[in-house]
């Protein structure tokens, strides 16, 4: 049964792309490239002097044509249109060359692009090859995407065993989306025994990494004492954190909490505020039209636990590469 839906962010964001691509020390780059020269290319990029960054990166390639980090930097400049005319297709060629020389981030970017046919011909098999290159270097996002591919499995029954392996490796590498995916699998009992305690554990790991969808899931479990110790005040605080990050589901839950006085004193002003924020985020709720009470006072309705969580870009999701989110259908 096909249970995976891809929510794909295809825009290459400009927020901290240097950190996303080149989170290596100067010593590590020197060891990789066999060069002890000052890192003029990356220094220029960080200063915003993109034309100088391109010149210096090309100088590095003249010295060492196999300088994968310099190749990746040029790809970054072309994908941004920083110091050059934006040319996504040319950027992909630079990323491919860097990937072929062992640059993990470039292998992930190019593999993800191949998977979707983004500025390159769509090719699922080559995509897997490049993602596996990145995964072999413990790239968390590549491992997570391979896990999602195992669930989607080209329309065939999901390969849960393979997906779990990828997700757990990605989780160990600190990938929030993988932690969230594991939480969903344990919560729904897809491919393994249902275990709310373990689900809550993984949702909390993802929430601690600022993934707002996971904040919502963990907060609801915490509010109801399902899989996590009941703590309504902490749950409300976590929902506020997710709501302030722009998660419409969190905003909707907060509106109900304030309207009905669940765990706190009723506050219709706050209820209206969060209801309106959720509407702005695309989540309308007729039950809140007049802030009417639709749930009991003992906790959030069981329906809350199965409500879909709207994907919302967070710090971990707004970096340069295409990010694939996959809320699972029951």
For every predicted segment, state its role:
Residues 32, 63-66, 80-82, 101-103, ...:
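Short helix-capping/linker turns of helical repeat alpha-solenoids
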Residues 48-55, 85-94, 121-130, 157-166, ...:
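Structural signature of tandem alpha-helical TPR/SEL1-like repeats
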Residues 34, 265-330:
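Terminal, low-structured helical/coil segments at or just beyond the last alpha-helical repeat
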Residues 37-44, 56, 60, 71-80, ...:
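Hydrophobic face of amphipathic alpha-helices that form TPR/SEL1-like repeat modules
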Residues 7-20:
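Bacterial N-terminal signal peptides
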Residues 27-36:
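TPR-adjacent "capping" and linker segments in tetratricopeptide-repeat scaffold/adaptor proteins
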Residues 59-60, 97-98, 133-134, 169-170, ...:
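Canonical positions in the second alpha-helix
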């Amino acid at each position: 049964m096909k249970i995976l839906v891809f929510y794909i962010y295809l825009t290459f964001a400009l927020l901290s792309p240097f950190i996303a691509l080149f989170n290596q020390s100067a010593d590590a780059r020197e060891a990789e490239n066999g060069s002890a020269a000052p890192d003029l290319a990356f220094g220029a990029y960080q200063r915003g002097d993109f034309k100088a960054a391109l010149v210096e990166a090309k100088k590095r390639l003249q010295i060492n044509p196999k300088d994968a980090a310099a190749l990746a930097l040029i790809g970054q400049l072309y994908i941004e249109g920083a110091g050059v005319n934006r040319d996504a297709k040319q950027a992909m060629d630079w990323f491919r060359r860097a990937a072929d020389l062992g640059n993990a981030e470039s292998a992930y970017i190019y593999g993800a692009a191949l998977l979707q046919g983004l500025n390159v011909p769509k090719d699922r098999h080559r995509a897997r090859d490049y993602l596996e290159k990145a995964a072999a270097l413990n790239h968390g996002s590549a491992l997570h995407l391979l896990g999602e591919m195992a669930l989607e499995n080209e329309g065939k029954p999901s390969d849960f065993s393979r997906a779990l392996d990828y997700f757990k490796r990605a989780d160990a590498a600190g990938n929030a989306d993988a932690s969230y995916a594991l939480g969903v699998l344990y919560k729904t009992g897809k491919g393994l025994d249902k275990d709310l305690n373990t689900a809550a554990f993984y949702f909390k790991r993802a929430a601690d990494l600022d993934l707002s969808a996971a904040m919502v899931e963990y907060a609801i479990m915490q509010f109801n004492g399902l899989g996590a110790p009941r703590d309504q005040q902490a749950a409300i605080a976590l929902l506020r954190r997710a709501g302030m990050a722009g998660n419409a589901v969190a905003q909707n839950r907060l509106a109900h909490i304030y309207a009905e006085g669940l765990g706190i004193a009723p506050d219709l002003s706050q209820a209206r505020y969060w209801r309106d924020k959720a509407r702005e985020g695309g989540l309308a709720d007729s039950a809140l039209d007049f802030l009417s009470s639709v749930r009991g006072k003992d906790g959030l309705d069981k329906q809350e636990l199965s409500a879909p969580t709207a994907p919302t870009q967070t710090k971990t999701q707004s970096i340069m590469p295409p990010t694939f989110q996959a809320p699972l259908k029951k």
